[in-house]
UniProtKB/Swiss-Prot annotation:
This protein's name: Serine/threonine-protein phosphatase PP2A catalytic subunit
SMART domains (alphabetical): PP2Ac
Phylogenetic placement of the source organism: Eukaryota, Viridiplantae, Streptophyta, Embryophyta, Tracheophyta
Residues where Mn(2+) 2 binds: 88, 120, 170, 244
Compartment(s): Cytoplasm
Length: 312
């Protein structure tokens, strides 16, 4: 085991977290130092990262910093609450930089109390289209912070397993994956590929139709109840929890309550009018959804994005 960081470095990190909680970005140099520490922690985590309950499971955030602050207000501060985030921290919202920096800082400060999975937006290619790249340029005057973060994204775990029974990931299942060991055995440290198992985990969606289907997203697959039932049976799972899709109530059951979608960005893109939710799993593995609405905004710019939408 590495030695625990000294209290001096904790103090510095606590100051950075306090600054980020006020939605003030760190310097480029501070981001670089933070991401170096985060990489050392994330390198040790598994493609299927084990997580103990109690835990609060969260879906997409998409740079909606004030709503993330609201999430922590409702769900409890980290480290008081153990958190599991299922990806898509950046793009679309106005504060991707502050959002992802805060989550990474919390990971470095409390590595056992927060798990950050990779979403399909934690990728070099997607962030160049949907806002994170442009935001880094605007806030730092160059692309260095974007590069630092997208290099770090390669190390984020792809999935998590809560108490051996709730399988958590951003997107969904893959026709090339039958078991959790299949996932444990591949090399995740790379840009999200255009196809194949790793791509599918971050891009696929559950569907009402049986079997595998072609995804309208152009990546991943749709998978039916027969597929999720087989996967859950093979791997001794009770539930698949995933994010990746806007759901108006903040959560949505599928496949006879064996798959749930959790979405944690209320009024998505500042215009969708949806609720957000988080899923609390307690010591006895009882599950409770907590829904929330957007945090009150003061003087926030009205962001109109010129980027294409995919709400599918």
């Amino acid at each position: 085991m590495d030695p625990v960081p000294s209290s001096a470095s904790h103090g510095n990190l606590d100051e950075q977290i306090a600054q980020l909680m006020q939605c003030k970005p760190l310097s480029e140099q501070e981001v670089r130092g933070l991401c170096e520490k985060a990489k050392e922690i994330l390198m040790e985590e598994s493609n299927v990262q084990p997580v103990k309950s109690p835990v609060t499971i969260c879906g997409d955030i998409h740079g909606q910093f004030h709503d993330l602050a609201e999430l922590f207000r409702i769900g409890g501060k980290c480290p008081d609450t153990n958190y599991l985030f299922m990806g898509d921290y950046v793009d679309r919202g106005y504060y991707s930089v502050e959002t992802v920096t805060l989550l990474v800082a919390l990971k470095v400060r409390y590595p056992q109390r927060i798990t950050i999975l990779r979403g399909n937006h934690e990728s070099r290619q997607i962030t160049q289209v949907y806002g994170f790249y442009d935001e880094c340029l605007r806030k730092y005057g160059n692309a260095n912070v974007w590069k630092t973060f997208t290099d770090l994204f390669d190390y984020f775990p792809l999935t998590a397993l809560v108490e051996s029974e709730i399988f958590c990931l951003h997107g969904g299942l893959s026709p090339s994956i039958e078991t959790l060991d299949n996932i444990r055995n591949f090399d995740r440290v790379q840009e999200v590929p255009h196809e194949g198992a790793m791509c599918d985990l971050l891009w696929s969606d559950p569907d009402d139709r049986c079997g595998w289907g072609i995804s309208p997203r152009g990546a991943g697959y749709t998978f039916g109840q027969d597929i999720s039932e087989q996967f859950n049976h093979t791997n001794n799972l009770k539930l698949i929890a995933r994010a990746h899709q806007l759901v108006m109530e903040g959560f949505n059951w599928a496949h006879d309550q064996k798959v749930v979608t959790i979405f944690s960005a209320p009024n998505y893109c500042y215009r969708c009018g949806n609720m957000a939710s988080i899923l609390e799993v307690d010591d006895s593995r009882e599950r409770t959804f907590i829904q929330f609405e957007p945090a009150p905004r003061r003087g926030e710019p009205d962001v109109t994005r010129r980027t294409p939408d995919y709400f599918l």
